[in-house]
């Protein structure tokens, strides 16, 4: 089963594609949709065009996205919510339904601790996939963690 995991952001959007089969997960591709500083409308367009490219190059059985985290700055929350809304609409138009996980759910699924640091998540992602190299930046490891969380959740539901 091919799963796309997405870690939305207003500067970079991490994405990861894994193949999940009988409890074994293989990383197919991971990267960033880089969003250049510009007006919000152009940034959202850039994000959606990046997602379009991913869907043009791959087909997916499942898509999972990390929910936005709580931020203290209301402007940040509003901007992230707009990016998240655009991503949600684009995924629904191209693929259909998708799963959503909070950052705490992702951290708990990957590390066993809901309050794990991004570095701890990155360490466990590397370990769970049997990778020899570190994956940078952390937006990418977060996207992989979202995909792994969804794969684990699907195994539990089956």
Swiss-Prot record:
Q: Where is the active site?
A: 7, 66, 139
One GO biological process term:
DNA repair
- Quote the Gene3D superfamilies the UniProt record gives: Ribonuclease H-like superfamily/Ribonuclease H
Q: Which cofactor does it need?
A: Mg(2+)
InterPro entries on file? RNaseH-like_sf, RNaseH_sf, X-over_junc_endoDNase_Mg_BS, X-over_junc_endoDNase_RuvC
Protein task: The RuvA-RuvB-RuvC complex processes Holliday junction (HJ) DNA during genetic recombination and DNA repair. Endonuclease that resolves HJ intermediates. Cleaves cruciform DNA by making single-stranded nicks across the HJ at symmetrical positions within the homologous arms, yielding a 5'-phosphate and a 3'-hydroxyl group; requires a central core of homology in the junction. The consensus cleavage sequence is 5'-(A/T)TT(C/G)-3'. Cleavage occurs on the 3'-side of the TT dinucleotide at the point of strand exchange.
> What is the protein's given name?
Crossover junction endodeoxyribonuclease RuvC
What organism, scientifically named, is this protein from? Campylobacter jejuni subsp. jejuni serotype O:6 (strain 81116 / NCTC 11828)
Q: Give the organism's phylogenetic lineage.
A: Bacteria, Pseudomonadati, Campylobacterota, Epsilonproteobacteria, Campylobacterales
């Amino acid at each position: 089963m091919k799963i796309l995991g997405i870690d939305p952001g207003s500067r970079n959007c991490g994405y990861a594609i894994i193949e999940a089969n009988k409890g074994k997960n293989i990383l197919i591709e991971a990267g960033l949709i880089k969003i250049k500083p510009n007006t919000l409308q152009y940034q959202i367009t850039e994000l959606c065009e990046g997602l379009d490219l991913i869907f043009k190059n791959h087909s997916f059985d499942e898509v999972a996205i990390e929910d936005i985290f709580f931020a203290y700055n209301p402007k940040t929350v509003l901007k992230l919510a707009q990016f998240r809304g655009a991503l949600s609409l684009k995924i629904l138009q191209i693929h259909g339904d998708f799963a959503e996980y909070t950052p705490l759910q992702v951290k708990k699924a990957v590390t066993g601790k809901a309050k794990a640091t991004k570095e701890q998540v990155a360490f466990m992602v590397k370990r769970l996939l049997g990778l020899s190299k570190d994956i940078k930046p952390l937006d990418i490891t977060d996207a992989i963690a979202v995909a792994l969380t969804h794969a684990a959740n699907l195994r539990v539901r089956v």
